[in-house]
Regions:
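A structural "domain/chain start" motif
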Residues: 5, 20-69
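A short, hydrophobic beta-strand-centered structural micro-motif
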Residues: 43, 73-99, 106-107
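Solvent-exposed, acidic/flexible segments
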Residues: 49-57, 99-104, 128-139
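Residues embedded in well-ordered secondary-structure elements
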Residues: 11, 32, 97-99
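Sec-dependent bacterial lipoprotein signal peptides
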Residues: 1-23
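C-terminal/domain-edge helix-coil "capping" segments
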Residues: 23-34, 63-66, 70, 117-151
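Amphipathic beta-strand/beta-sheet edge segments enriched in Tyr/Trp
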Residues: 98-128
């Protein structure tokens, strides 16, 4: 009897753990966007949100840099002039609820460097057992969507 009770408790705990860890993500492209024409990315004024989350923002930047996009320095004006019609500039926004079991949301909006028109928006969210777990789940979800779009 006691063994059945323990197995029952373990099964309930496993179901709760599975139900409390959730990720979602999506990509929205502008109607006339030809994402394949973009070969470069310039980081700059790309962040907004809580400065405490700069580590998450840096992780998203690293994920973007690991794609097929080549990172350009804003000071490389000659290369920017040559390639300006194929450069994206991302705005990365991260919010994280400060309690365990809260959400972390990551939104990356890619803008055409020349026109400042939004080309693509990638969103992810994560719900986990702790704040760091939320962030890890959201980062994994955004990584998948970034790779889906640019690799």
């Amino acid at each position: 009897m006691e063994q059945k009770f323990i197995i029952h408790i373990i099964s309930i705990a496993a179901m709760i753990a599975l139900m409390t860890s959730c990720a979602s993500g999506k990509i929205v492209l502008s109607n006339d966007a030809n994402i394949s024409k973009y070969k470069y990315v310039i980081f700059g004024k790309e962040t907004s949100g809580d400065r405490e989350l700069d580590d998450v923002v840096m992780s998203v930047q690293n994920q973007i840099a690991e794609t097929n996009l080549t990172v350009l320095s804003p000071s490389n004006t000659l290369k920017i002039f040559e390639c300006s019609d194929s450069i994206l500039s991302p705005n990365i926004h991260v919010t994280s609820e400060k309690w365990d079991g809260g959400h972390t949301y990551i939104t990356v909006t890619f803008y055409d460097y020349n026109t400042n028109q939004s080309v693509a928006v990638i969103k992810s969210s994560g719900i986990g057992m702790t704040v760091s777990h939320d962030q890890s789940i959201a980062l994994n979800a955004i990584r998948k969507k970034i790779n889906e779009l640019f690799k």
